[in-house]
């Protein structure tokens, strides 16, 4: 049990993020296949269990092995996955609101997730900015996770805004627009850095190959958050320009989806693709992009857009099942809990 606690990395919460977004997209596409609504509820309850098991291990690791946790925060690659605990809370907040219609618990998860994400969005970049050991080898799409977490804040936060008044409403509006603004422009800056690495450096190591899908995270989350903010902000009287930007941004995401598929096939054929926890990077980014696809369809009414989303949904479901099975096998063998940070 001690090895499980000692080597429990924050990146495990990516499983909660992925399962949560699969639950939401299952609910969305239950319009086509009603049984998906039941699957959505099953995934929701399974995800709650996952989260609290992981949260217990995460807290125990802070108590028993604080040096390991601090080392993770300072690591040029692993540090980017530290915010996943906060993003997982934000995703559960979304699930409670959309799947269970439970605004109260949705608010609680959103508040803790937003606070955690605010802290991580400062801590992780701070350590990176002052580090003198970061190299081009360390650059990878996992660096998008802190910006993605900020962008996820207004997804649930915008759904909460109409239910608040006075200073609490104003504070929530401020938090939502801060999250989207800070996250989106940090993503644009990091996009240039990551593309630079892709073009002028050697390919990602096979264990990090699935992170190419993380590019879809800020795109999908950015679209969903922007649409939610616009729809729930009475002071925005002309909404069409934001909708059009969302559609354009969605097109960029479609290109990334195709590129991610091509790159994954390349890694499978040329470099192999051994299982690693990074496989969970397949899930959340693709899932949130699928959610954005459904929202774009709802706004513009282009059925072909929703058909694309429904097709990608089954790819998402396939990724989730394979990754879950592989993860369970590796947990059983103990391979995922070997010492990595000393």
UniProtKB/Swiss-Prot annotation:
Q: Which residues form a coiled coil?
A: none
Please name the GO terms of the biological process aspect recorded for this protein, alphabetically: sulfite transmembrane transport
Swiss-Prot/TrEMBL keywords: Cell membrane, Membrane, Transmembrane, Transmembrane helix, Transport
What subcellular locations does the record give? Cell membrane
Q: Which terms in the GO cellular component ontology are assigned?
A: plasma membrane
Q: What are the transmembrane regions?
A: 8-28, 39-59, 79-99, 108-128, 142-162, 175-195, 207-227, 242-262, 276-296, 304-324
**A Pfam family per the record:** SLAC1
Q: How does it sit in the membrane?
A: Multi-pass membrane protein
Matching InterPro entries: SLAC1/Mae1/Ssu1/TehA, Sulfite_efflux_TDT, TehA/Mae1, Voltage-dep_anion_channel_sf
Entry keyword annotation includes Ubl conjugation: no
Q: What is its main location?
A: membrane
Q: Which GO terms describe its molecular function?
A: sulfite transmembrane transporter activity
Note the NCBIfam families from the entry.
Answer: tdt (TIGR00816)
Q: Which family does it belong to?
A: Belongs to the tellurite-resistance/dicarboxylate transporter (TDT) family.
What protein name applies here?
Uncharacterized transporter MJ0762
Native species of this protein?
Methanocaldococcus jannaschii (strain ATCC 43067 / DSM 2661 / JAL-1 / JCM 10045 / NBRC 100440) (Methanococcus jannaschii)
């Amino acid at each position: 049990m001690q090895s499980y606690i000692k080597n429990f990395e924050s990146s495990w919460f990516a499983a909660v993020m992925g399962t949560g977004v699969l639950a939401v997209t299952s609910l969305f596409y239950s319009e086509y296949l009603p049984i998906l609504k039941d699957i959505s509820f099953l995934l929701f309850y399974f995800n709650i269990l996952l989260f609290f098991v992981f949260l217990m291990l995460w807290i125990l690791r802070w108590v028993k092995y604080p040096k390991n946790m601090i080392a993770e925060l300072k690591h040029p690659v692993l540090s980017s996955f530290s915010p996943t605990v906060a993003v997982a809370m934000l995703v559960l907040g979304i699930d409670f609101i959309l799947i269970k219609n439970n605004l109260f618990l949705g608010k609680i998860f959103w508040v803790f997730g937003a606070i955690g994400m605010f802290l991580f969005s400062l801590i992780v970049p701070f350590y990176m900015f002052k580090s003198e050991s970061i190299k081009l080898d360390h650059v990878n799409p996992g660096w998008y996770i802190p910006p993605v977490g900020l962008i996820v804040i207004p997804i649930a936060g915008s759904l909460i805004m109409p239910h608040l008044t006075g200073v609490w409403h104003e504070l929530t509006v401020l938090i939502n627009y801060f999250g989207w603004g800070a996250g989106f422009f940090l993503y644009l800056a990091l996009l240039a850095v990551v593309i630079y690495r892709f073009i002028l450096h050697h390919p990602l190591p096979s264990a990090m190959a699935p992170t190419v899908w993380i590019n879809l995270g800020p795109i999908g989350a950015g679209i969903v958050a922007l649409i939610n903010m616009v729809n729930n902000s009475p002071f925005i009287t002309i909404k069409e320009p934001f909708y059009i930007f969302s559609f354009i941004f969605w097109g960029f995401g479609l290109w990334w989806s195709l590129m991610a598929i091509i790159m994954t096939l390349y890694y499978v054929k040329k470099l192999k693709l051994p299982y690693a926890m990074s496989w969970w990077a397949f899930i959340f980014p693709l899932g949130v992009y699928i959610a954005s696809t459904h929202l774009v369809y709802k706004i513009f009414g282009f059925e072909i857009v929703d058909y694309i989303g429904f097709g990608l949904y089954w790819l998402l479901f396939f990724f989730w099942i394979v990754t879950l099975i592989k993860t369970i096998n590796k947990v059983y063998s103990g391979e995922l809990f070997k010492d990595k940070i000393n």
